[in-house]
């Protein structure tokens, strides 16, 4: 018997077409907090109502975020049971860890089930699981717990990514693209889940960066099914992933970051963050779309991680974008806050639903080509070129 050539073996292993997003699912905790009443709630549950001047400043911060409402896991009842979470810097990691190890996989499972339901395939066909979260570090990891909750095959190939933050929603699509295109018939379940339990803490007059986090972050999970060569009549493509790249802005590691300590997770942000991101997005776009010949960024649809209102304003101004381009990202941010790695999946879900509701020609607001952007600590910029499908 003639031995198969290495080239033939590799060809047989690879998919024929590009990686394709086949379904999107999202989930949030049940507890909805309106932004206009959140300052009263926050200062009450942290026993800080005597800090009236600081509360007034926090109220102004909440208004400036442009967030209308957020979903959060923590409730007054949970905080009463674990009062250390309400202090500013009391050692409390064990209390926080006890919560996230259990709750991160649970919320992730809700989003994953929604994506799997839309996809319509059998869980036994899921070959890979890629999961990211800032919190929930444990052994076995949150990926193991999620696979157990979903009843995924024992042979599913799992990859867990911890402590990465906002850009990882896009980064996981880069990883899923490589998996799907290099493993024929692979179906990749991609899940991002963020719960702010690690970073919740009481207010302090000396730490306005911590207050900024309390004003803007929300809890949520997003999931996608990614695979190449969709089964006709069974699987319904939403977007093709045509390319995916990452770049790191030099000498920017101090612009945004977090540190895991006994007190939980602490964040820092530099005021120059919006400008740094806006100044570097253009180069990433130019490199990504050069093979396609697109140079006008108003001729593509946008699935962008919002970050915050100032970041979107800076990108819009720097690139000369029409207001409609980031409208979906702004809408998601105002309705859910910054859910870090999961946010961009909510943006994609909103875009494809809005495109259908408004009778657009494609899932990309009527346009063929688009970009999915993520940015996070590093500063790391993820650029994913998408091709929409007809509606």
From Swiss-Prot:
Active site: 166
Major enzyme class: transferase
A Pfam family hit: Chal_sti_synt_C
Record EC number: 2.3.1.217
Coiled-coil boundaries: none
Family from the record: Belongs to the thiolase-like superfamily. Chalcone/stilbene synthases family.
Name this polypeptide is given: Curcumin synthase 2
Species classification: Eukaryota, Viridiplantae, Streptophyta, Embryophyta, Tracheophyta
């Amino acid at each position: 018997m003639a031995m198969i050539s290495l080239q033939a073996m590799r060809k047989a292993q690879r998919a024929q077409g590009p990686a394709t997003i086949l379904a999107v699912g999202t989930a949030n905790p049940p507890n909805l907090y309106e932004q206009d009443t959140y300052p009263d709630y926050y200062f009450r549950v942290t026993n800080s109502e005597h800090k009236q001047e600081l509360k007034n400043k926090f109220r102004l911060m909440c208004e400036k975020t442009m967030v209308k409402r957020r979903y959060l896991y923590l409730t007054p009842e949970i905080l009463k049971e674990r009062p250390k979470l309400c202090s500013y810097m009391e050692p409390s990691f064990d209390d926080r860890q006890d919560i996230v190890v259990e709750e991160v996989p649970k919320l992730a499972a809700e989003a994953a089930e929604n994506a799997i339901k839309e996809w319509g395939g059998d869980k036994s066909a899921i070959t890979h699981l890629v999961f990211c979260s800032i919190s929930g570090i444990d052994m076995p990891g949150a990926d193991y717990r999620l696979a157990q909750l979903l009843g995924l095959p024992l042979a599913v190939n799992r990859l867990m990514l911890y402590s990465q933050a906002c850009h990882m929603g896009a980064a996981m699509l880069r990883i899923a693209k490589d998996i799907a295109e290099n493993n024929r018939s692979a179906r990749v379940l991609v899940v991002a889940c963020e719960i702010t339990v690690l970073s919740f803490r009481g207010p302090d007059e000396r730490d306005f960066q911590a207050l900024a986090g309390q004003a803007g972050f929300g809890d949520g999970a997003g999931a996608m099914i990614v695979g190449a060569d969709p089964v006709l009549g069974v699987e319904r493509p939403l977007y093709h992933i045509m390319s995916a790249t990452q770049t790191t802005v030099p000498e920017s590691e101090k612009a945004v970051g977090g540190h895991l300590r006994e007190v939980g997770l602490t964040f820092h942000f530099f005021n120059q963050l919006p400008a740094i991101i806006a100044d570097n997005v253009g180069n990433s776009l130019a490199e990504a779309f050069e093979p396609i010949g697109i140079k006008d960024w108003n001729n593509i649809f946008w699935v962008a991680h919002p970050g915050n209102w100032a970041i979107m304003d800076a990108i819009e101004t720097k690139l000369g974008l029409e207001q409609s381009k980031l409208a979906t990202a702004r809408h998601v941010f105002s309705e859910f806050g910054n859910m870090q790695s999961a946010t961009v999946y909510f943006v994609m879900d909103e875009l494809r639903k809005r495109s259908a509701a408004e009778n657009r020609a494609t899932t990309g607001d009527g346009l063929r080509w688009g970009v999915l952007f993520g940015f996070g600590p590093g500063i790391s910029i993820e650029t994913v070129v998408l091709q929409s499908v007809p509606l």
